[in-house]
Design a protein with these regions (language model features):
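Short flanking/linker segments adjacent to small metal-binding domains or redox-active Cys/His motifs
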Residues: 40-86
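Short Cys/His-centered divalent metal-binding micro-motifs
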Residues: 2-21
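C-terminal, charged low-complexity interaction regions
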Residues: 74-203
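Intrinsic-disorder-associated interaction segments
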Residues: 29, 33, 51, 55-58, ...
């Protein structure tokens, strides 16, 4: 979708950062994410660099990764990204927690929702319309279940390239002060079969 140079650069950096952080937790054998983990490993390995400049960049990327690590003692079950918890049987000392910035999550979800509205509905999200990116949820959570049901019954799913599925639907909520029904555009984004982002827009 059309965007100004500043926004394109800003959201591009956010997307790149989140993609890098999320890559580290995907299943390297899953069809939706095949090759992703291997690509990240290569991007961190200076020995794979062809030039000195590239070698320095890979070292900076490794240093950046090290700064993302959160002490294991600070991690609680309720702040682990859904479906990114430890693999059963993994020794505790082998776990490396990586932080996902909440603001980055929201900004990336907003970018996906705005872009999807433009592509699927041929419309812009105006400045007075709120894009509500929901906190990470497990698929069995009540709110996630309701959104999936609404998309299944009143929407469609679109496969946008390998490992990326967009669910797009409509629901109505009642405004208590007026009793009128307000339409909501619903989105469910699934990336690599692992990252799931839910968003809604009040129309």
């Amino acid at each position: 979708m059309p965007s100004c140079e500043e926004c394109n650069r800003k959201y591009g950096q956010i997307e790149s950062d989140l993609r890098f952080r999320s890559w580290l937790g995907v299943d390297p054998t899953a069809p939706q994410s095949l090759g992703i983990a291997q690509s990240v490993q290569r991007s961190l390995d200076p020995s794979k660099a062809k030039r000195e400049k590239d070698q320095r960049a890979r070292k900076r990327q490794f240093d950046k990764l090290r700064d993302m690590v959160i002490p294991l003692s600070m991690i609680q079950a309720d702040n682990i990204l859904p479906d990114f918890g430890p693999v059963p049987g993994t020794a505790k000392e082998d776990l490396i927690p990586i932080g996902i910035p909440a603001e980055g999550w929201k900004a990336f979800g907003t970018k996906l929702a705005r872009g999807s509205a433009f592509v699927l509905e041929d419309r812009y999200i105006e400045v007075d319309q709120k894009v509500d990116v929901l906190p990470p949820m497990y698929e069995e959570d009540e709110r996630a279940t309701k959104i999936r049901r609404a998309i299944r019954e009143h929407g469609t799913y679109h496969r946008v390239g390998p490992g990326f599925v967009v669910g797009h639907g409509l629901a109505f909520v009642e405004k208590t002060e007026t009793g009128l029904l307000t339409p909501l555009t619903l989105f469910r984004f699934e990336i690599w079969g692992r990252v799931r982002i839910y968003a809604q827009i009040v129309n």
